[in-house]
């Protein structure tokens, strides 16, 4: 009798969780479908003229034989006063201070865009942003470190951005 009661409670709890997931998923699915449909056409995450100075993935360090590093995103150099901007509609999931700079993270359904090496942020956690909305000012050497993920999986941002 105790086992049957426990099983009933577990089933009720599982059904409740499933309903929550379905509610959340429909919004997520809409966001994902729109985001995925724009692969290769998303705007550059930096204002003004730019140059990609470091690409995604592993690379050999110049002058150091046998030393490789892994870039989790791309590094984009802009001009003086350049700003980071949202690549797609989303919600600010975090604004963090890290190693003397600011990092902004946006959630677009299951996708997350990360804007690092900012000197300041003009958005706050929980805020909804639109595509091309300014997120903050790019910091030292005018280099934005931009990352893109689908949940925890790192993606090559260059495959998603238009030129």
Regions found by a protein language model. Name each.
Residues 95, 134-137:
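Short basic/hydrophobic patches in alpha-helices and adjacent helix-turn junctions
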Residues 121-133, 152:
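Acidic, glycine-anchored pre-beta loop/turn
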Residues 138-146:
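Active-site loop architecture of trypsin-fold serine endopeptidases
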